[in-house]
Design a protein with these regions (language model features):
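Metalloprotease/metallohydrolase-associated module, dominated by Zn2+-dependent proteases
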Residues: 29-109, 153-208
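Bacterial N-terminal signal peptides that target proteins for export
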Residues: 1-11
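Mid-length scaffold segments of soluble, non-membrane domains
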Residues: 86, 90, 96-143
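Structured segments of extracytoplasmic/periplasmic soluble domains
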Residues: 124, 132-153, 173, 177-184, ...
Length: 208
């Protein structure tokens, strides 16, 4: 009778882890939470300044951002030894995302024009951060499939090492995907915001 062995195989934080005839089982666990930081202002310049000084910082940087998504990967795998070979019998990848968004606390009394600009910008910030969370969930699924597809090894120690290497590579790939997304978004930011603002103005019948 083969004996299962369970090990934690990955844990990473970003400012972005039976019987012999049973098939390998996967179970991605994704959770998401939200938090907010308050900003104040009566003009677009004041709101912009507040975002620049009160926004969250990204991992490894002191620069402030209008929004952020903290990502934490984790997981565990169960290995089963039989016939001189060890394989993964169960893998569970977890990913928790915390989306940090701005909240305009003294909006009452603001002009319709400024409110429309803010609604356009804040909606785009939320969309951007939600996409970061989605990229993390998609990568967790890829990592899980790759781990379950790994070939059996001579020992469970070797199997665990291979899982660790695969997990590390998956997280590195995740970081590159997130950076590429940010680069594309930055290039298109101004045109995108102007287009969204024009669409919002048209749908509301204009700003008075």
């Amino acid at each position: 009778m083969p004996s299962p062995t369970r090990h934690m195989f990955l844990l990473a934080a970003l400012c972005l882890t039976a019987s012999i005839c049973s098939p390998a089982v996967a179970a991605v666990v994704a959770t998401k939470s939200y938090s907010y930081f308050d900003i104040k202002g009566k003009t677009a310049d004041e709101l912009d300044q507040q975002l620049s000084t009160r926004g969250p910082t990204a991992s490894g940087s002191s620069a402030r951002h209008p929004g952020a998504t903290k990502i934490r990967f984790g997981g565990e795998a169960t290995y089963i030894q039989d016939g001189g070979r060890c394989r993964v019998s169960h893998a569970k990848v977890t990913v928790h995302t915390q989306i940090i968004l701005p909240r305009w606390s003294n909006r009452n009394g603001a002009s319709k024009q400024l409110s429309m600009i803010w609604d356009t910008l804040s909606s785009d910030i939320k969309r951007h951060e939600e996409r970061h969370a989605e990229i993390a969930r998609e990568q967790a699924k890829k990592m899980e499939k790759r781990i379950l597809a790994l070939p059996p090894q001579r020992t469970c120690e070797a199997m665990q090492e291979l899982v660790t290497v695969t997990s590390t590579r998956g997280i590195e790939e995740h970081d590159r995907l997130q950076a590429r997304f940010d680069q594309v978004e930055a290039v298109n930011f101004q045109n995108r915001i102007l287009r969204l603002l024009n669409n919002r103005i048209k749908s509301s019948g204009g700003v008075h």
